[in-house]
Amino acid sequence: MSCYDLVERLNGTFRQIEQHLAALTDNLQQHSLLIARVFSLPQVTKEAEHAPLDTIEVTQHLGKEAETLALRHYRHLFIQQQSENRSSKAAVRLPGVLCYQVDNATQADLENQVQRINQLKTTFGQMVTVESGLPSAARFEWVHRYLPGLITLNAYRTLTLINNPATIRFGWANKHIIKNLSRDEVLSQLKKSLSSTRSVPPWTREQWQFKLEREYQDIAALPQQARLKIKRPVKVQPIARIWYKGQQKQVQHACPTPIIALINTDNGAGVPDIGGLENYDADNIQHRFKPQAQPMRLIIPRLHLYVAD
């Protein structure tokens, strides 16, 4: 497919996302709002976009105010829609839930609307990350050439719709991206980096090459069967735990965007019990269960690469 055709599809798909989101928010406002609770988080400034988040202060919003914030959030796709001081790289998150009363017909209609939006968002993301054939570093410039100011994460981010929950509880999740590697796989990656002539700020080309050579030597000195692991921290994420009484099961969802909960009164469903979201404090995290971790030693800090002792 030509670049021109891909750009045409990219723009066309994005316009459909905008149109369907507008239709969804209009449709939701035609339904009876049973309960709404969302939690705004402090805006991340450009200066602090890479800083670790040790504390997050939460502000709760209820009822129609919460609904207004949520519906606006679903359509927040461009940096022009936010403060000039706010980071365009840090995700804009608004955990919470909107609960609407539906019957069988309106439930099916809303489910189809959300499913269509999520399909379009997934297709859009595939165009940018796969069909473009571009490395991650080049995608930002490519997308913004055709959609200036787009917040790509907000465009990719799908909506979560649930039916007839009994309880909804909110919390925080600390996660890591973990990938197990062999010694030879790491050596292969470092060899590719060594063959490149580029430098990485703040190092000069010579300093960067020297750093890579030292890393290569450190890995090459390990036994071939050494167990290596990348353990990269991900910024703390708001989550929602949903309990379904009839099925007697709990489901956990990432909750960067307000969940849409449909309460089908035709089936006798009632208003769910909704909890709050506490402020986040990294120094006071309570783990329900934390298994004993295998002793690991950090060997290449920039890659978050560890070796088992």
UniProtKB/Swiss-Prot annotation:
Record's subcellular location: Cytoplasm
Family, per entry: Belongs to the Tus family.
Protein's job: Trans-acting protein required for termination of DNA replication. Binds to DNA replication terminator sequences (terA to terF) to prevent the passage of replication forks. The termination efficiency will be affected by the affinity of this protein for the terminator sequence.
Name recorded for this polypeptide: DNA replication terminus site-binding protein
Keywords for this protein: Cytoplasm, DNA replication, DNA-binding
NCBIfam families for this protein: rep_term_tus
Biological process annotations from GO: DNA replication termination
GO cellular component term of the entry, any: cytoplasm
Species whose genome carries this gene: Salmonella arizonae (strain ATCC BAA-731 / CDC346-86 / RSK2980)
